[in-house]
Amino acid sequence: MEAAKSASGNYKLMTDIDMTGVEWTPWDFSGTFDGNGHSILNLSVKTVSKKTMKTYDGNRKEYETYGAGFFGVLTGAKVTGLNIYGARIEISTTEPCFAAPIAGLADDSDISDCIIKDTYVSLTDSAKMWGTGGIAGFGSGNLDNITTDVTLVCVDTDAAVRDEQFMGGAYAAGFLNIRNCSITIDGYDSDHGYVHDGGLVGMYMVYPLELSKTYQGEVLNNKVKGMITFFEDNTDRRAYCQANMGEVMNWTYAYSGFTSDFKRNETYDYSVTLLPEMCSNPSYSDTVTEATAADFGYTTHTCSTCGYMYSDKYTIHEHKVDNYSVVKEATGTDKKDGIEAGTCSLCNQTVYREYAANVVTDDNEQTAGNKASDSQSKKGLSESTAVFTIIVVVIIAIIIITVVIMVQNNKKKRRHNRQRRRR
């Protein structure tokens, strides 16, 4: 995706994108990104952002923190209408980090009208502050009209650190307004420090850290469904885990319209890392749902031992476009920076594709093929005509020679007969 090379600007996604086989580097961004209702399929993130952002824990201690997600660090950005299906964000680090499907970190940024489905976010960390979120990780701004269905996993690898760990179905920690969001969360948290988990938010706190200001936030008309399974291996126990907010550090917000079907599931066997697979040796069978003109295809994996199920490997249905027209001219390099558009005869959607100026399109390839075929035909015809002409000339020459010989023989015969009569 060429746009990811820019740190700012205004962009609109014009088609669904299957990112199978692409190891995505989180995009640090400060512009406007309009997903236009289109989807990113099979996003895979295994590295953190290039930039860091300052974060704070509940004790107001500061950390330079990395982000991981489709976006790494959003700064004064606006993201709308972006859907994410079948993403796997799997980070292992020793640095402070927050991971989430849309953005790991958000500074005064707005995210709205997005759908996140069948997405897995796992963060294995030994740092002092870290966490996972179902939309964003840590920050400030607004979350509006978002539906997310996520599996979140936090694994603490250093029992001596006594970390500050955060997990939330909407976001892990910070001060983002949350309005009209629907959260489905399946969370797993293995921690040896201080747990801050919530179906909606892990820790709702003052951010940015300007204590002279009064922040009036909004947490309105949200619903949460699911469960967080966790342990807190710490004698100085906190074990914050609630359906809405694990811990609240700032009460200056409007709160109403919250509904939940949520279970807090605390365990006490600290030797077993908590994961979605409830058995030690999962064995999966696969069921493939084919894509249609209206819906994506996907593969559902079911463990025959413990019954755990998840879906991934999303596919886009094949479009049938008879004619494409140029929307953006290519620059004349090998790079595919031109755009063509056509209408699918199966689903009536507008379909876009990239092309390079010096590479002919399928239609042109067909035309070129026809031209080549015509050329070969003409060449073959010309060669055949030449051969025929030669044959005709040879035959005529043979006939002429034959006639000449016959005439000569007749002359000789007549002379011979005259000589015989004289005798």
What are these regions (language model features)?
Residues K411-R423:
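Cytoplasmic C-terminal tails of single-pass
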Residues M1-C279, G369-K371:
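Surface-exposed repetitive/solenoidal architectures
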Residues E277-G369:
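Extracellular modular ligand-binding repeats in secreted and cell-surface proteins
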Residues G369-V393:
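Extracellular Ser/Thr-rich, low-complexity/disordered mucin-like segments
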Residues I391-T402:
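Core hydrophobic alpha-helical transmembrane segments of single-pass membrane proteins
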Residues I400-K411:
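Juxtamembrane cytosolic interface motif at the C-terminal end of transmembrane helices
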